[in-house]
């Protein structure tokens, strides 16, 4: 625990008086405590308990375009990695304005970010836009990117991330051009660019180099580090799942071969990230084909025969399959269209 307190000097007695609150009083139960001056990054914080690890870069408004850049998100692992990180670090609904919260939670995507909501709040806030939702999604996105960079740079999570480390990560992942110009100038130690209301024609310098172009020029010959996500890959390297064809499999020579179920968790994880096939909302667990001779006791259809459905339509299908297919089309048709799309965009190759 770290505490930020305002001291009261008593020079006549050579004493210093501190007044901690209820939450911070327990730090003085230790035999000794460490006292150090207030850092510049904490001057605007109120007195009281300070977070164990505070990230000043997360509060830097000039870095918001960098954290929300699509290339930066892909370099950090993609939206799927963001969802996994949220599920590991957030155990309850993040929406503070609800009067009721369900115990089950889901990932609610908003813009380039995401948040953890319970089923009730997810239904209430779906298709809604507000500054509170945008701020919450941006905070989660920023915290995730900073956590990824800290782990890639030093492997430890118990330290503050510096601007130099963030810039180096951007260089290694070939996204340095996503850094705002003001941030690039700070990284190079250049003075802040002065914006005047009126310029003279003689002040215009043609072909003046920007800080971003200087960074790109100086780092163009650097090879990406092993942990860096490559930005330029061949279509084969971008595929989620590759299917191997074996025209002489042992079962193909048997009269009554034992059925082997095709399992591909990587593909079903990708299906889970796709929009619902009925309404376009974020999907829940992928639905495996039922009926049509598929599935059975202790087994289910191949992982290839899956369909992204939200929780509402997933429950609707299992409640009344006939009514669902009358309303949205047969499962075979929906799955065929989805497989056709997966093949067309290179996910299955």
From Swiss-Prot:
Gene3D superfamilies associated with the record:
3.30.40.190
InterPro entries in alphabetical order: DUF968, HNH_nuc
SMART domains with a match to the protein in the record: HNHc
Protein name per its UniProtKB record? Uncharacterized protein YdfU
Please name the source species: Escherichia coli (strain K12)
């Amino acid at each position: 625990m770290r505490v930020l307190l305002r001291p009261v000097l008593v020079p006549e007695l050579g004493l210093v008086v501190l007044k901690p609150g209820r939450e911070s009083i327990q730090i003085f139960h230790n035999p000794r405590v460490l006292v150090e001056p207030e850092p510049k990054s904490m001057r605007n914080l109120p007195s009281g308990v300070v977070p164990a690890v505070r990230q000043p870069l997360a509060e830097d408004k000039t870095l918001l375009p960098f954290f929300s850049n699509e290339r930066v998100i892909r370099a950090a692992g993609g939206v799927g990695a963001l969802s996994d990180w949220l599920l590991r670090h957030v155990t309850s609904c993040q929406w503070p304005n609800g009067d009721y919260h369900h115990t089950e939670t889901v990932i609610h995507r908003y813009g380039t970010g995401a948040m953890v909501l319970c089923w009730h709040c997810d239904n209430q806030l779906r298709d809604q836009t507000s500054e509170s939702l945008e701020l919450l999604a941006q905070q989660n996105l920023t915290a995730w990117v900073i956590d990824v960079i800290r782990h890639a740079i030093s492997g430890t999570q118990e330290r503050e991330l510096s601007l130099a480390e963030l810039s180096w990560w951007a260089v290694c992942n070939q996204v340095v051009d996503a850094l705002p110009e003001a941030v690039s100038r700070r990284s190079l130690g250049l003075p802040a660019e002065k914006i005047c209301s009126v310029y003279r024609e003689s002040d215009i310098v043609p072909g003046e180099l920007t800080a971003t172009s200087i960074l790109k020029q100086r780092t163009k010959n650097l090879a990406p580090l092993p942990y860096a996500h490559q930005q330029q890959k061949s279509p084969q390297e971008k595929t989620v799942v590759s299917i191997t064809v074996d025209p002489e499999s042992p079962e193909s020579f048997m009269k009554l071969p034992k059925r082997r179920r095709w399992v591909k968790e990587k593909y079903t994880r990708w299906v889970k990230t796709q929009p619902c096939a009925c309404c376009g909302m974020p999907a829940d667990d992928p639905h495996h084909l039922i009926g049509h001779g598929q599935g059975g006791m202790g087994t289910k259809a191949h992982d290839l025969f899956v369909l992204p459905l939200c929780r509402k339509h997933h429950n609707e299908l299992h409640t009344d399959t006939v009514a669902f297919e009358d309303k949205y089309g047969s499962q075979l048709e929906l799955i065929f269209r989805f497989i056709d799309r997966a093949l067309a965009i290179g996910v299955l190759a």
